[in-house]
Amino acid sequence: MHGTMHDMRTAARSLVRAPRFTAVALLTLSVAIAVNAAMFTFVTAVFLRPLPYASPEQLRDVNIDALEGRAFVAPRIRQVTGVLAPQGGVAPYTERGFVVSQTGPAAEGPPIFVPGAGADDRLFGVLGVIPALGRAFTAADIVPGAAPTVVLSDRFWRVSLASGPAVIGSTIRIEGREHLVIGIMAPRFAFPDFAEIWVAQPMADARFGETRVLFRGRAGNAETAAQALEAALGASGSEAHVRMTDLLPRGGALLAALLGAICFVLLIACSNVANLVLARGTGRRQEIALRAALGASRGALVRYLSMEGLLIALGASVLGTLGSVWMGDLIVAAIPSDGLPVWFEMQLDPSVLGYIGALTAITVLISAALPAFTVTRGRLATVMNEAGSRSTGDRSSTRLRASFVGAQVALAMVLITGAALLLRAFRSMNDVDPGYAADSVVELRARHAGLPGGDDFLRAALDRLSGVAGITAVAATAAGPAGRAVPTSDAERAVAPVTLAVSAGFFEALGLPLVAGEAFEPGREQVGVAVISESAADLMFGGASSAIGATFAFDGDSAELTWRVIGVARDRRRPSIGGRGIERQRYVYVPITAALAGEVQLLARVDRADPLSTASASMAALRDLDPDVVLRTPRMMGDVERDLAGNVRFFASVFTAFGAVALGLAALGIWGVVSYTVSRRTREIGLRIALGATPTRVVREVAVDMLRPATIGLACGSLGGIAMGRLLRGVLFAVGAADPASLVFVVLVFGGVTLLSAWLPARRAARIDPLAALRSG
């Protein structure tokens, strides 16, 4: 112990006497550890930390796939709960938003839109949670005629109600009705992820497609329950595929790629510092030889040399831990506020601290212990002879330096290849033509506590918007009945297209042309007519020409309720990631008077250079029309379409940032090794120049020694880049895992950076003054 403490004090004094080396090594490792710790904290918070429910691993979301095979659309919540109840707990719920008014202490201010859920008395019990204040729903809250009740989230209570202590037993107005507040949930609770209020709601009449089902199974019986439900649905004439999915998001291969990327950054940083330590140790071989001559064993020498690396690693861990908090804030700030669930929390828990401890151990092993073992190799006489010369050290040190350079190049190549693939995929997704004038259309979502989809509100809203300067066409849309299937030309198959209720002028405002037939006419009552998309026409009637004048009915409707096709619109298109190409969306458009709309999407075609200023004027016009209308932030439809590439954009940003850091570290490593080689071979190079070597030859010989391991690193990195592409397949679009263009681009860029990093110090070698070099030797 005394020897260890003595070595530690000696190492500390040595580091103080070499401030540049200490600062560079400390900064390099601190940044790498901070990046690793911040990303691991984020990954832990999103993917690994248990959800705020009792035994969350037992919970499953029941998904009934009605898009393929015989579509399942009948309102059978009771049947599903009846089948699943013997297998475990089951609770239906409806994820939706609510218009809430009179929330302030003085009941002032406009109504607000609040995400939430409709639930009955089973939901909180199946989740295994109880309110922090008050109570949960009971059967008495669900019976017909019961007083409306609501449970609030902790955040809604604190932000919207200012943590009023008397909130339990008070009322707030939701969707135009007074609701009694009966409970407040714990701070981190949310289900679904973004819900802030839960309204008591009977589920007996809910439709699939509008309502989801939560299931708490017993150990390993989720598949059995799914099979039993499929069998029951099939026996009742509704074929469907039932999937039980975990509530916790799974990263899979993408998570492995992300964790691999941050580890690569650390390994590159460790390789860089190891090269610095190795160069520093080689320059101290005379000191090492003297200690060995005085009786120090190799183990004692390794311990002595490793102490410097240990102190640097410990210091970098402390700085990296502090820096990870700041980097974590940057990561969270880069994600939209509505992109993270309520239960998300970045914190340095024991798992993160353990991860940082493991990083420290890896850092010490690579950047300190390995160079120390290498420097102390060899016999004493050999070490003494080398110590008295200006050589670059023994062959093992040279090989290890070259290996570190090759490893840095290979790891950086993998990261940059991943970034190139993701950037190409992101660009390809943004280049997809959506089929309409998305960048010229502003979307405003309006909701009212009364009847926002009523004719009076719509007519007045559209009239007001038409008078706003810069708007050339307006229309309104609302979601139609969800999960409603229609027959196809194949009698054995049905599909469930997206049903939209639209106003007259919708296709003009959206810039979505018709390929056959006509659109809905303004000022004319149209009942029982529909416009369908090209892909829907192909499936339902075998083509657009056959669709005009044909009739169809939604499953579950009476035989008398049919729809006549009067037009066929161009398909709306969007990219489908994971190598599935461009998705042609199937739509059925019906007149908006034929649907009950909970939220209206107002669309305005604009021709001004600043469309968002037009949107602001539009919002003012609507609020002037009705102060109680709730408006969401206006957006360009082009931005809405581009949001589909959100995951790709996130991974592309992460890999680009990591790739840039890795490229810089690798270039710095090559430059440092070549610079060190030049400094140790000054006398030799001066002698060669004195004997007639040309500057070009000197540059070539100095640089080639480093280009060999770099070339091997490029080859290995190319293979690793292909493997990384395979891990990223889940977020790639129109780009293969082994995309030749991306690989060639990365090789050329990295090859150029490698040449430049080696050429700059090699050029300095060619300018050495032979006489000065020989005198210094």
Feature locations, PLM:
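Alpha-helical transmembrane segments of integral membrane proteins
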Residues: 1-23, 243-248, 276-303, 307, ...
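Short, strongly hydrophobic transmembrane alpha-helices
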Residues: 18-46, 50, 268-271, 313-317, ...
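Alpha-helical transmembrane segments
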Residues: 31-58, 327-335, 411-440, 675, ...
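Small-residue-rich transmembrane alpha-helices
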Residues: 39-42, 274, 310-383, 424, ...
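Mid-to-C-terminal secondary-structure elements
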Residues: 115-139, 148-253, 329-330, 459-653
